[in-house]
Amino acid sequence: MKTISTRAAVFTSPAVDVVGKAFEEVSASFERFCLAAGIEALSAVMEKDAEEACGPRHCRSADRRGYRWGRTSGKIGFHGGKIDVERPRVRARGGKELALPSWEQAVAEDWLGAWAMNQMLLNVSTRKFKRSMRLPQGDVPAAAGAALSKSAASRQFVALSAERLKEWMASDLSGPDILVVQIDGIHISEHLVLVAAIGIDGKGEKHPLALLEGATENSAVVQALIDNLIERGLDPAAPRLFVIDGSKALSKAIRRSFGSHTPIQRCQVHKARNITERLPKALHATVRRALRQAWELDDADKAEKLIRNLAKRLEREAPGVAASILEGIDEILTVTRLGLPNELRRSLACTNIIENMMGTIRRVCRNVKRWRSPAMALRWTAAAMLEANKGFRRLKAHKQLAALRIALKAHYEKNSSNRDLAHKAKAA
């Protein structure tokens, strides 16, 4: 079978001949037919741009902006690599080159960069990029400069992922009605930890919000994360629930920025895991059952009493663990104290959204053998979070979020009135 070349010579022939030749092989290579037809259409648009600047050929109009200056070839990246496309050159009366709008737009689209990024997110190794190109003849040796080498693919991914990370970390947050913010640490490697934030709006839709290098125990890191959210439009005065992994530094930073009355829910999954890891294996089932029973109660006072009784029972066998159970007990039962429905409590009592997202992050980062720098980890993880966002589903209990909004409003009004009474008493 004769292979259609994508060099400039193909596209200098008349449009009918090019499309006709491509159509002859459409049954064997429909992708090449589309590519040939698309490039010919681009060539026609560039000719039109040249005519608008110079007028019709052999016409010396007085109001023309420039004149033709031969032809040249340039490279445009597609999903199958870079190809040579011939284009007309136009110069202004002063001799300066005039850009063709259609050519500038085609180059700026960066189809090849977007294709390379999708390939990386699908775990295609850079060594296999040539074979994974969408044109059927993916195993045909690529011409020099086709940008299909592993180094070129890596450069394209680095550039585009860095650009996406920058755009994402500067995106406006004043639009979404964020009711819940979950913040948790993501362990990329033994010595590399990132802090991620995900929001849930009033309709139950999930939004990746931010990502920073560092641990949740680092007060400077968590404060920088929160400052970034506020600078991008997250209203610190709006009633909102925070779900965190249990870090004291994170709790302090939230209350410092959003107010001392801000409701914070500690992740119950993290809490149970931290407790059982310090206990003998024989006690694991008993302790988990007691904690689950407490968390499923609708009465926060009864739930707290049950947890305190559990701590008393463990004082003899594991006194250190007993103290750990009582640590942060108010924040463990926040969703219960707010009076939320049981199904909504289960959804908001832990940071499982971030935990579940780790599956996508591990899949996307599976081919990374060595993390060269924190910047590399940020780029890859941000790309994975945005990839995971495509598959996010609404919160299961999204119909009950109206109850959360009412409970948060009542909580804020109650604490506001208490502060006013305290100020009056102090003034008296």
Where do the PLM segments sit?
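Metal-dependent DNA phosphodiester-chemistry modules and their immediately adjacent helices/loops
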Residues: 85, 275-305, 309
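Acidic/histidine-rich catalytic cores and adjacent linkers
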Residues: 2-5, 14-25, 34-37, 43, ...
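RNase H-like nuclease fold core
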Residues: 3-7, 19, 58-59, 68-71, ...
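Short, amphipathic alpha-helical "recognition" segments used to contact nucleic acids or chromatin
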Residues: 111-123
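Short, charged amphipathic recognition helices of the HTH superfamily
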Residues: 122-135
